[in-house]
């Protein structure tokens, strides 16, 4: 059983009992998470598609931890100008455990 859920404007595939890597969430929301913006639910081949969301559906999750992704390095070099720029960025993600999908 899996569901497509919209969290902070992005869509994720949530499977019961598995971890979900989402963009970092605020500390206020970190206790028990419930998302009701479910776009699609698939249970044993039976598919429910929302318009835009599935009515009376919910995904319950548990917050686990925040982690940083690998560093992405951006480098710009301008020839003949003695100009170069190097910038690094590490995106922070939250890992949540999908407890159950209710519909």
From Swiss-Prot:
GO cellular component, as recorded: cytoplasm; ribonucleoprotein complex; ribosome
Superkingdom as given in the UniProt entry: Bacteria
GO molecular function, one term: rRNA binding
InterPro entries assigned to the protein according to its UniProt record, in alphabetical order: bL21-like, bL21-like_sf, Ribosomal_bL21, Ribosomal_bL21_CS
Keywords from the named record: Ribonucleoprotein, Ribosomal protein, RNA-binding, rRNA-binding
Record carries keyword Ribonucleoprotein: yes
Keyword Transcription regulation in record: no
Pfam families: Ribosomal_L21p
Disulfide bonds: none
Transmembrane segments: none
NCBIfam families: L21
Family to which this protein belongs: Belongs to the bacterial ribosomal protein bL21 family.
Database matches in HAMAP family: Ribosomal_bL21
Protein name (record): Large ribosomal subunit protein bL21
Gene: rplU
């Amino acid at each position: 059983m899996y569901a497509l859920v919209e969290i902070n404007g992005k869509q994720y595939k949530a499977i019961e009992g598995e971890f979900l890597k989402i963009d970092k969430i605020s500390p206020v929301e970190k206790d028990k998470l419930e998302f009701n913006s479910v776009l699609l639910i698939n249970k044993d081949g039976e598919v429910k598609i929302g318009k835009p969301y599935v009515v009376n559906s919910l995904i319950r999750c548990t917050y686990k931890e925040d982690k940083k992704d690998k560093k992405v390095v951006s480098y710009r070099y301008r020839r003949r100008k003695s100009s170069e720029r190097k910038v690094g960025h590490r995106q922070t993600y939250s890992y949540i455990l999908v407890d159950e999908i209710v519909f």
